Amino acid sequence: MLQNLVLAAAEEGAEHEDSVLVPPLAELIVGLLAFGLLVGFFFWKIYPQIRKTYAERAERIEGGLNRAERAEREAQALLEQYRSQLAEARSEAARIREDAQAQGRQIVEELRTQVQQEVAEIRERADAALVAERAQVVASVRREIGEIALELATRIVGRELENDTRQRQLVDDFIAGLDEAPQPDAVPAGPGV
C-alpha cells in the first residue's frame, strides 16, 4: 500500500516537479537509510536492553508471586495447624468437663451413701436408746406396780407380808398376770362420746 502511494506520488511528481507531497528521490533514499539505521541501532542496542529489563522485571514479578504463593501455603499450613490445635483443645476441654461431671456425680453419690450410712447409724442408736429407755421405763413401772400391789395386798389382807421372797413372788405373779392379760388396742368410745 505504501509502495502504491509512493508510485502514485512519483508519477504525479513527474508531471509536477515541485510537489510538496512527493520528496525528491535522493531525500527519500537518505531518509529510508537513516530510518533503517535507526531501526537497526534500536534492535542492536536498545531492544536487548529492553528485553533484559523486561526479563528481570518478569523474574522479579514471578519471584514475588512465588514468594507470595509460598507464604500463602505456609499461612494455610499454620492456619490448619491452629485449627487442629483448637479442635484438640476443644476436645480436651470437653473431656475434662465430662471427667469433672463424672467426678462430681461420684462425689455426690459417695456423700449420699455416707449420709445414708450415718442416718442408719443414728436410727440404730436411737432405736437402741429407745429400747433401753423402754426397758428402763418398764422396769421402773413394774417396780412401782409391785410396790403398789404390795401395799394394796397389805391393806386387803390387813397384815404385812413378812417374807421378802414371798413379797417378790407375789409381785412377780401379779405382773406376769398383767403381761398375759389381753391389752386393748384402742380405748372404746363411751355412749356419751
Swiss-Prot record:
Gene3D superfamilies: F1F0 ATP synthase subunit B, membrane domain. The keyword Transport applies. It is found in: Cell membrane. Disulfide bonds: none annotated. The keyword Transport applies. Pfam families: ATP-synt_B. GO terms for molecular function: proton-transporting ATP synthase activity, rotational mechanism; proton-transporting ATPase activity, rotational mechanism. The chain crosses the membrane at residues 24-44. CDD domains: ATP-synt_Fo_b. PANTHER family: ATP SYNTHASE SUBUNIT B, ATP SYNTHASE SUBUNIT B', CHLOROPLASTIC. Belongs to the ATPase B chain family. This is ATP synthase subunit b. It comes from Parafrankia sp. (strain EAN1pec). The lineage of its organism: Bacteria, Bacillati, Actinomycetota, Actinomycetes, Frankiales. The gene is atpF.
